Amino acid sequence: MQHSIGKTLLVAALATAIAGPVQAEKKSLHIYNWTDYIAPTTLKDFTKESGIDVSYDVFDSNETLEGKLVSGHSGYDIVVPSNNFLGKQIQAGAFQKLDKSKLPNWKNLDPALLKQLEVSDPGNQYAVPYLWGTNGIGYNVAKVKEVLGDQPIDSWAILFEPENMKKLAKCGVAFMDSGDEMLPAALNYLGLDPNTHDPKDYKKAEEVLTKVRPYVSYFHSSKYISDLANGNICVAFGYSGDVFQAAARAEEAGKGIDIQYVIPKEGANLWFDLMAIPADAKAADNAYAFIDYLLRPEVIAKVSDYVGYANAIPGARPLMDKSVSDSEEVYPPQAVLDKLYVSAVLPAKVLRLQTRTWTRIKTGK
């Protein structure tokens, strides 16, 4: 996944106790998470309860996170990779194996979801589910109707066919700046395997995206949240919860902007974001304390309410705001889930092909 890049937030610093001439050592924790992906009070509430100061940085693509991890000196105690990147990072030795004796609230997690995640993390040995969601189309109802008329917004054709994009360009279109999100969607739209290894398939997806490239206002994986909410763009390829946040911001602003989200009828990506402890973490015990804190139903319920993403704890759903817990955009019905695909761990050769293809699409070279 997702999910605005900001400066490091030093949250809820507490005065350290002085014992005679010796100052007690501060307990600290360094977290690297997706943009707009936690409730406003979560960190300060944790600090108040635990006495652990939290330093919090954000990113908006798995590629950015991977760059930190590959260096071997991430500087973080908790990071939040998506499921399709997790397997590769585990194989590279990027994470510590979990000590589940330090996670008493592990019992609160959904066993069925844990089983799904074993594709990337056999035995659930390295990562803890945080939130999950889908990719789809976020759009400004009035502006899109203005340029497309009564055409239903229910297909990837809205974004992947030039005749539609040419019209939408008048009010602004945002695509994610992430080949591992955009290319599988185009492959799936073409009826091809979104996890294909075949270069010929990627060539077909490249052709689709290259044809609509002239009509894309920009490529960014989080800017579209505020731009949808403000009416600066009318449509975006986006994460479900990010569009939910845009809709909430638009409603709060009271300017009559109605933002909706749709999972196209052809299907879309179902993804999971997970908490993991980097191999070079210096405060692993504090990381366990925070992860276990987030495994409390009442804590993760507030996070889901704020960010608009589903969580992995069944006991949290009754505690959530009905507008979130009952939303089919957040918790899709089974008929929709059946059409979704989960991104697989791809070999390095295919990932390089994805990267080269995406660079050509973006630059037109």
From Swiss-Prot:
Keyword Hydrolase: no
Record carries keyword Hydrolase: no
Knockout mutant characteristics: Significant decrease in T3SS induction.
Gene Ontology molecular function: any one: spermidine binding
Gene Ontology cellular component terms for the protein in this record: extracellular space; periplasmic space
Taxonomy, superkingdom: Bacteria
Keywords: Periplasm, Signal, Transport, Virulence
Extent of the signal sequence: 1-24
Pfam family, one: SBP_bac_8
Classification via InterPro entries: SBP, Sperm_putr-bd
UniProt-annotated location(s): Periplasm
Biological process annotations from GO: polyamine transport
Binding-site positions, spermidine: T35, E181, D242, N269
Function: Spermidine-binding protein probably required for its uptake into cells. Binds spermidine with high affinity (KD=14.3 nM). Does not bind putrescine, cadaverine or spermine. Spermidine binding induces large inter-domain conformational changes. Implicated in induction of type 3 secretion systems (T3SS), which play a role in virulence.
Family the entry assigns: Belongs to the bacterial solute-binding protein PotD/PotF family.
Name recorded for this polypeptide: Spermidine-binding periplasmic protein SpuE
Gene giving rise to this polypeptide: spuE
